[in-house]
Amino acid sequence: MAEGETTTFTALTEKFNLPLGNYKKPKLLYCSNGGYFLRILPDGTVDGTKDRSDQHIQLQLCAESIGEVYIKSTETGQFLAMDTDGLLYGSQTPNEECLFLERLEENHYNTYISKKHAEKHWFVGLKKNGRSKLGPRTHFGQKAILFLPLPVSSD
């Protein structure tokens, strides 16, 4: 092709057999900081554990709209939420504190920012000891805010 020429690509019209059912399966959110899995306990506590067999780490990510998700524990039915102080907790019902902006970063990890506090850039994060990190203490570039969605089964 000569310089200055333009080309167009033909549209792909074939159907792909993608396993769409897998998108609906629960995930584990593996934190880059310390190797913890995000966990929502029955009492509403949010922390991390290294125990992959813990039932409280199985999470369902439910899209509200493009880039906006609810994160729900399949075991407790509670939704991940962030209050006005930036504390993570489990909520019995979905509300504005439960909606997070999901973003795939260049390093292939996901970050989750509270939609309610998006202008403050408060991320979901776990400390090196597995405790949840307050939103105001998180910022872009920290390992504490990087999560890798993994399948529940290791096969």
Curated annotation (Swiss-Prot):
Record has Transport as a keyword: no
SMART domains (alphabetical): FGF
Protein localization: Secreted; Cytoplasm; Cytoplasm, Cell cortex; Cytoplasm, Cytosol
Residue(s) carrying N-acetylalanine: A2
PROSITE patterns per UniProt: HBGF_FGF
Gene Ontology CC annotation, any one: nucleus
SUPFAM superfamilies per record: Cytokine
Molecular function as annotated in GO: fibroblast growth factor receptor binding; growth factor activity; heparin binding; integrin binding; S100 protein binding
PTM description: In the nucleus, phosphorylated by PKC/PRKCD.
Main location: secreted
Task of the protein: Plays an important role in the regulation of cell survival, cell division, angiogenesis, cell differentiation and cell migration. Functions as a potent mitogen in vitro. Acts as a ligand for FGFR1 and integrins. Binds to FGFR1 in the presence of heparin leading to FGFR1 dimerization and activation via sequential autophosphorylation on tyrosine residues which act as docking sites for interacting proteins, leading to the activation of several signaling cascades. Binds to integrin ITGAV:ITGB3.
Family: Belongs to the heparin-binding growth factors family.
Designated name of the protein: Fibroblast growth factor 1
Record organism: Bos taurus
Gene that produces this protein: FGF1
